Amino acid sequence: MAQVFNFSSGPAMLPAEVLKLAQQELCDWHGLGTSVMEISHRGKEFIQVAEEAEQDFRDLLNIPSNYKVLFCHGGGRGQFAGVPLNLLGDKTTADYVDAGYWAASAIKEAKKYCAPQIIDAKITVDGKRAVKPMREWQLSDNAAYLHYCPNETIDGIAIDETPDFGPEVVVTADFSSTILSAPLDVSRYGVIYAGAQKNIGPAGLTLVIVREDLLGKAHESCPSILDYTVLNDNDSMFNTPPTFAWYLSGLVFKWLKAQGGVAAMHKINQQKAELLYGVIDNSDFYRNDVAQANRSRMNVPFQLADNTLDKVFLEESFAAGLHALKGHRVVGGMRASIYNAMPIEGVKALTDFMIDFERRHG
């Protein structure tokens, strides 16, 4: 079968080694004669899977001991509600940074539970979209927490700064599309959450990292399935968890460790992004509308100078084994999502195709 590279923004490409191992183990996991999908989440066999996955995740991010790791349902949108329901306490407002589509979605959900103070961080630099530096974010005095999205998958915008607002500010962040792609100082955050379907594993699992002093503050109306304290007290098994997604994510964590960990992946991700942006920037045929300082290394949107060629580009790229390059309906054009599992060979195949397509159609 011809090589296919999947540039989907999520569910996204998984490492080939992980898929092959899962295939080998699918019907007879560890000699039990059953699939890991079939065994009880409370049995000792799956408990070992769960514990190893958490420890490997902790190792990869150097998560401090005073942080809890929760394996949850609900995706990022579930946490749009989970964050205010767990962290507001007796306060009625929180600071929300708006820098793109997903940040705005979090704000919309938060309005059901509080009166968010919106920090509009969107700016234009030399005609390109950018984000205000953190030093220009005007935080309010009475906010229960600060929320932002470090990587906007649709807009292709990244906020790479590490927050440093002092110990009194509880920083929360949606790391769904950038978790494990670069070193992360977990100690600068109160809550980090990430849907698994981009850089961790298959859809259906959500990871939450929460500082333990923030537990026990959930609103009385918070659904139990979103209550961090309930989930922590039940080892993320308050109800039946998405066991197969948990298992596969654990395999991805082991794969990441074998690649050299997050620091090694960060270098590879930089190389992939530089290769793709280099082709875009050295061409009048392709265009990216994000300022260099805020360009995402995970999601690279680009436009063709002649958008009547979009359909042809997508058809020919798909035939060449380069799948899921259509941009989000909000922005159009193309988008290449190049998460950890995308090898540099995949990006090279894309850039070679782009150069050839320009030669033939430019």
From Swiss-Prot:
This is Phosphoserine aminotransferase. It is found in: Cytoplasm. Disulfide bonds: none annotated. NCBIfam families: PRK05355.1, serC_1. It comes from Salmonella typhimurium (strain LT2 / SGSC1412 / ATCC 700720). Belongs to the class-V pyridoxal-phosphate-dependent aminotransferase family. SerC subfamily. Pyridoxal 5'-phosphate binds at G76, R77, W102, T153, D174, Q197, N239, T240. The modification N6-(pyridoxal phosphate)lysine is found at K198. Catalyzes the reversible conversion of 3-phosphohydroxypyruvate to phosphoserine and of 3-hydroxy-2-oxo-4-phosphonooxybutanoate to phosphohydroxythreonine. GO terms for cellular component: cytoplasm. Transmembrane segments: none annotated. Keywords: Amino-acid biosynthesis, Aminotransferase, Cytoplasm, Pyridoxal phosphate, Pyridoxine biosynthesis, Serine biosynthesis, Transferase. GO terms for molecular function: O-phospho-L-serine:2-oxoglutarate aminotransferase activity; pyridoxal phosphate binding. Its main location: cytoplasm.
